[in-house]
């Protein structure tokens, strides 16, 4: 069941009625959910259900459901199972032929996407990037191959390093939107080229959604890569009077790779 991301007025009438009618509420953080229940003047039994106890608690909650009781599953904010606990109990409920009823509502990634100005026709959601360096690099390489809008979540203390990793892989000319503290008091949308945004970032606070325009001239760039070599492309721009720095920047953008990658190629020649 979805709950507000930040603005309590985003709770739906159906969600309120559901919270009132169920026997138990399984919450990611019972203290956080208790604040919402107090605001709504609802008193219910709360059971902790988070990432670290998801497997054990799922079995316990399934037993309760099999007794004929109703449970509402909520995360701290937004929709459960979207970068939050919930997937495991849904699987187990299906295996036990227990009815699952979605109670729709706020979802941070969707709300950020629809006001981003970036294509909503096709998109891939990657949640939070892995912490492990190898896994992180592999995931970014996977993103690099996509030709659709990309959506990520990121915490404030890791935002700058994540933006730099994305910039190195996709190019600093890549257009992005940062949705900060969506639906909250300090909601803000930062739009522009990733290189420019990185240079302006300071005193980073709040939760962020990163939306990447990963469809920019993708097909055209792929054709360039397939048709001519880097050396041929370099010579074409050289005859037009561009400097080496300008040529490297232009090739990197057209091939959707980092400037450093192109620079290293010509350095070895």
Regions found by a protein language model. Give the residues of each.
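Glycine-rich, flexible N-terminal cofactor/catalytic loop recognition
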Residues: 1-51
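Short glycine-rich anion-binding loops that position phosphate/pyrophosphate groups of nucleotides
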Residues: 5-8, 76-80, 156-158, 215-217
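Short active-site oxyanion
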Residues: 19-25, 98-101, 149-150
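General beta-strand structural signal in soluble alpha/beta enzymes
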Residues: 27, 102-105, 152, 178
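Conserved helicase motor
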Residues: 49-55, 129-132
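Short glycine-cluster motifs
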Residues: 67-130
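A short, charged helix-loop
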Residues: 124-145
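A contiguous loop/helix-start segment that scaffolds small-molecule binding in enzyme catalytic cores
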Residues: 149, 153-269
């Amino acid at each position: 069941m979805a709950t507000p991301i930040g603005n309590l007025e985003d709770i739906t009438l159906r969600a309120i009625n559901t919270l009132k009618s169920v026997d138990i509420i399984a919450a990611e953080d019972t203290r956080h959910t208790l604040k919402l229940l107090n605001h709504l003047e609802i008193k219910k039994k709360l059971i902790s259900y988070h990432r670290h106890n998801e497997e054990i608690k799922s079995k316990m909650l399934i037993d309760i459901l099999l007794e004929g009781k109703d449970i509402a599953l909520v995360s701290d904010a937004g929709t459960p199972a979207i970068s939050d606990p919930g997937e495991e109990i849904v699987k187990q409920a299906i295996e036990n032929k227990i009815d699952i009823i979605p109670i729709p509502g706020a979802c941070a990634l969707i709300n950020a996407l629809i006001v981003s100005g970036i294509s909503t026709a096709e998109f891939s959601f990657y949640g939070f990037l892995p912490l492990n360096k190898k896994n992180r690099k592999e995931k970014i390489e996977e993103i690099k191959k996509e030709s659709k809008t990309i959506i990520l979540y990121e915490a404030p203390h890791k935002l700058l390093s994540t933006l730099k990793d994305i910039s190195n892989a996709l190019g600093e000319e890549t257009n992005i939107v940062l949705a900060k503290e969506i639906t909250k008091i300090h909601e803000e949308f930062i739009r522009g080229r990733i290189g420019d945004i990185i240079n302006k970032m300071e005193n980073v606070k709040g939760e962020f959604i990163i939306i990447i325009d990963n469809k920019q001239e993708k097909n055209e760039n792929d054709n360039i890569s397939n048709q001519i070599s880097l050396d041929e492309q370099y010579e074409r721009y050289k005859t037009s009077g561009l400097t080496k720095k300008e040529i490297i920047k232009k090739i990197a953008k057209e091939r959707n790779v980092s400037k450093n990658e192109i620079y290293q190629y010509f350095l070895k020649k």
